[in-house]
């Protein structure tokens, strides 16, 4: 079973988190993220698990929608291609700006996501991307830099 970086427990041993994401976790689309390198030394699946788990913990502490944050964290990089070999589609812009839209469309097509989850996925690169999130959420896209977005 999977474990978030620095967590002492596997995620199946953390029922309040696991209950939020178990339906997504064993799908072929989420599993496929394990085939892509995210940054040096980690896969996109491990990165997404880290974002998901720590987003969940931080949102729970702040009394935000922790389940939606966990689900959005797991799906926020759901683009199924190698970003280093990907040719941007016209109008998509560079990868940093364009991939949230691709991840959102993939997530919305493959899974039942709510408005908050969709918003967090589509706008997780703000302020690099042009659209500001519509909901109060926590974006934990870098393990060392939680950014609280109060919208």
Task: Briefly describe each language-model feature range.
Residues 78-88, 125-140:
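Short amphipathic alpha-helical segments at helix boundaries and their inter-helical linkers
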Residues 47, 76, 95, 99-100, ...:
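Histidine-centered active-site/metal-ligand motif
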Residues 52-54, 98-108:
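An active-site-proximal "capping" alpha-helix that borders the catalytic cofactor pocket
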């Amino acid at each position: 079973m999977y474990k978030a970086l620095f967590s002492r427990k596997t995620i199946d041993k953390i029922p309040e988190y696991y209950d939020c994401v178990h339906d997504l976790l064993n799908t072929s689309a989420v599993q496929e993220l394990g085939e892509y390198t995210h940054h040096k030394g980690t896969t996109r699946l491990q990165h997404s698990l880290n974002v998901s788990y720590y987003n969940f913990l931080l949102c729970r502490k702040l009394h935000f929608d922790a389940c939606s944050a966990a689900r959005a964290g797991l799906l926020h990089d759901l683009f199924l291609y190698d970003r280093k070999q990907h040719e941007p589609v016209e109008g998509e812009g560079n990868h940093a700006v364009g991939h949230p839209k691709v991840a959102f469309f993939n997530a919305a097509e493959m899974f039942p996501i709510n408005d908050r989850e969709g918003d967090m996925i589509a706008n997780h690169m703000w302020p690099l991307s042009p659209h500001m999130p519509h909901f109060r959420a926590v974006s934990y896209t870098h393990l060392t830099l939680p950014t609280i977005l109060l919208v």
